[in-house]
Amino acid sequence: MMDFTQGSILKKLLRFMVPILGALILQAAYGAVDLLVVGRFGSTSGLSGVSTGSQVLNLVTFVVTQLAMGITVLIARYLGEKKEEQIGSIIGGGTVVFAAISLVLFVVMVGFARPIAVLMQAPEEAVGLTAAYIRICGAGIFFIVAYNVLSAIFRGLGDSNSPLLFVFVACIVNIVGDLVLVAGLGMDAMGAALATVFAQALSVVFAIVRLVKKGLPFTITGYDFRWNPQCGKFLQIGLPLALQECLTQGSFLALCAFVNRLGLEASSGYGVACKIVNFAMLIPSALMQSTSSFVSQNVGAGEQKRAKKTMFTGIGIGLLVGCFVFVLVFFRGNLLAGIFSADAAVVQRGYEYLKGFAPETLLTAVLFSMMGYFNGNGKTVWVMLQGLIQTLLVRLPFAYYMSIQPDASLTNIGLAAPISTAFGIVLNVACFLYLEHAAKRS
């Protein structure tokens, strides 16, 4: 376990963040491999099916990750407060809660896969493959949820290396699975979904074995595996984050539906662009996750000034890397899109979206670091509220308006993300200054 309450903030934050970033890169990589292999060896309908279906899976995964953030923050806080004996009941209660969530997701994704595909306005020729992708991923949702919860537990313990190993295993298995099922057996989108589920299953087995063998500073008993007071505590932290993430990802699903109305090429191009966007957002996402744990442990130890310095350090790291990512996405986005598809029209449509989205790579460095700071302080209701405002008042209305124009442009639709993020930064700066003023007065 890593002690974040002393020593160089920059060095320790980077040391903790790099494995998280590595895990996110590998996670995005095995998602991208699905699209890459289907794009090269499958059909255009299969590519659209994976593109649209993976948007649904991303929604589920990101919401579960944010809900599990409550476990991460609470474990880190108890470590800072030297109350390790409380952690066993967090893990036991979390297992029960997320098992119930998995059961609900299983029923919805398997039983309503086709209506979901239709709701997403998947192109008519891709509805069947989109539904198949969603149904297969839904059948394996227990493994997908379990992986994210186990990773949250390890990060809360200050161990970001183990989740990196878990996703490395999943990535290798998924690549092999895609090559065998899609390129070899011609299973198209269904093969990609099967490879994803099997990879997550093996990763979960590996994670459980590592947790059991790990020398833990607490004990877990059978009595911990029930609804207990810790469940309410981590849900109080995680639920607002999950709702905020649900609406954010939901807005991107709506965006996907807006784009799908523009035709198969636009749908496939947007899917390709989304995979590149996933990679571009990895640094801010890693910063938010690492900052949340870092800040939470310091808040638990009463080191509020150090917690604030952590936020500003995160912003600096994010902006430095964000400049490079912005240049790459804005000026060479066509080359990036060409990695995922050999269809010139699909590549061009993907690049159109990326040019509008590019400023987001800089703005999220600020926004996500601030969100990590608020998460670590337990201000997750605020994180939810600012996300609601961004989504409902800016991102969705702007994207919808741009999508219904006679000469609808994917570049203009892509601008919805950076414009809403800029608005979110203003809101978060105002909240930070308000809390600082209130703290000085008290």
Where are these regions (language model features)?
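Hydrophobic residues within alpha-helical transmembrane segments
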Residues: V18, G22, G53-L59, V96-A100, ...
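Helix-terminus/linker motif at the lipid-water interface of multi-pass membrane proteins
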Residues: I25, A29-S48, A117-E124, V180-M187, ...
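Small-residue-rich hydrophobic transmembrane alpha-helices
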Residues: L47-V107, I144-P163, G269-G333, T364-Q386
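Short runs within selected transmembrane alpha-helices of multi-pass transporters and secretion channels
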Residues: A68, C137-R155, P163-C171, A192-V205, ...
